[in-house]
């Protein structure tokens, strides 16, 4: 059983907004392993940028649960069937969200921007429930200017473009997490640092293996652009920001050269419908292989100030454009 409502001061719900969820008219369902199930539509009036809570009662939970640990959000767990309750004073706080794959809002904004990628989009370093990811700051900026546009974040920490990591590769999930989102008009793709980093972490590389990886990444980005254009979605690329200060990847000169080579390719005209040069925005001019101190968290991820800078640099006029379906 499940219900949806607007979240009040946590962990409470706005009782007046509590609505039951059904699945093909039934309150209960069985979801097969690795499958997903959409609920029937439900009418609920929500203010812009409201928090939405989904209550789930599991009669029998799976041995291994689906979870987005890097959601930068909290969940609350209680024993028994409490889907009709609006408060749970005895709830146990859990980091991340569990079992829930998406919430689809059937509004009709002029622009729907889906931002996807790895932990930088996922918001590494952002305190839970604080909404300080770069996409959160961009959403507030759009709202403050009265823009008829919304932002959807489908980043997954540890994600890679080509191969599965902490979740499926972006190439594999691009349809589900970007192109299939309701009303999507634009998408931002910021990914590749884990592809480069994992390729050399704890292993030897050769000029041939590095060249092969770059060619694979270029082909992967080109395929995303082709798939987006086939659906009339404007694809916005993004350069990879520097990470020489990362203790996790500890990149050497060869890895930095690969990042520079990939960024040069990403910057070439025609690769995307627009480009965000986050490398130029956040790098240290005196040490271009590293992030500037004021926007650096851990040598790999931006700080909260860095996320704000990314949002402030986004060219809002891009969202006024429309991209014709490629034939």
Each model region followed by its residue ranges:
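N-terminal secretory targeting modules
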Residues: 1-116, 126-129, 320-327
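Serine-esterase "nucleophile elbow" of acetyl-processing enzymes
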Residues: 85-157, 162, 166-167, 171-183, ...
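Solvent-exposed loop/turn segments at secondary-structure junctions
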Residues: 61, 119-123, 156-161, 193-197, ...
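Surface-exposed amphipathic alpha-helices with a cationic face
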Residues: 221-229
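The substrate-binding groove and active-site-proximal loops of carbohydrate-active enzymes
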Residues: 165-166, 206-215, 248-252, 298-299
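Catalytic His-Asp segment of secreted/periplasmic serine-dependent ester chemistry enzymes
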Residues: 171, 199, 240-327
């Amino acid at each position: 059983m499940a219900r949806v409502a607007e979240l009040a001061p946590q962990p409470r719900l706005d009782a007046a907004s509590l609505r039951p969820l059904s699945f093909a008219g039934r309150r209960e369902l069985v979801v097969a392993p690795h499958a997903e199930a959409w609920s029937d539509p439900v009418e609920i009036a929500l203010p812009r940028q409201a928090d939405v809570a989904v209550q789930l009662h599991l009669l029998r939970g799976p041995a291994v649960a689906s979870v987005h640990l890097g959601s930068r959000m909290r969940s609350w767990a209680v024993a028994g069937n409490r889907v009709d309750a609006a408060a749970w004073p005895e709830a146990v706080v859990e980091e991340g969200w569990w079992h829930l794959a998406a919430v689809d809002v059937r509004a009709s904004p002029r622009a729907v921007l889906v931002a996807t990628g790895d932990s930088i989009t996922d918001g590494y370093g952002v305190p839970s429930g604080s909404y300080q990811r770069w996409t959160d700051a961009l959403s507030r900026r759009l709202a403050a200017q009265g823009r008829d546009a919304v932002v959807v974040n489908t980043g997954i920490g540890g994600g890679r473009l080509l191969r599965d990591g902490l979740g499926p590769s972006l190439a594999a999930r691009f349809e589900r997490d970007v192109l299939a989102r309701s009303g999507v008009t634009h998408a931002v793709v910021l990914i590749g640092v884990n592809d480069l980093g994992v390729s050399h972490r704890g292993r030897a590389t050769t000029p041939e293996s590095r060249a092969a990886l770059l060619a694979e990444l270029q082909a992967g980005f080109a395929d995303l652009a082709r798939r987006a254009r086939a659906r009339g979605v404007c694809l916005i690329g993004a350069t990879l920001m520097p990470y020489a200060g990362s203790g996790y990847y500890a990149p050497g000169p060869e890895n930095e050269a690969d990042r520079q080579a990939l960024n040069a390719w990403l910057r070439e005209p025609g690769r995307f419908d627009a480009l965000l040069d986050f490398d130029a925005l956040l790098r240290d001019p005196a040490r271009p292989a590293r992030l500037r101190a004021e926007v650096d968290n851990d040598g790999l991820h931006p700080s909260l100030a860095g996320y704000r800078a990314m949002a402030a640099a986004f060219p809002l006029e891009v969202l006024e454009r429309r991209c014709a379906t490629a034939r």
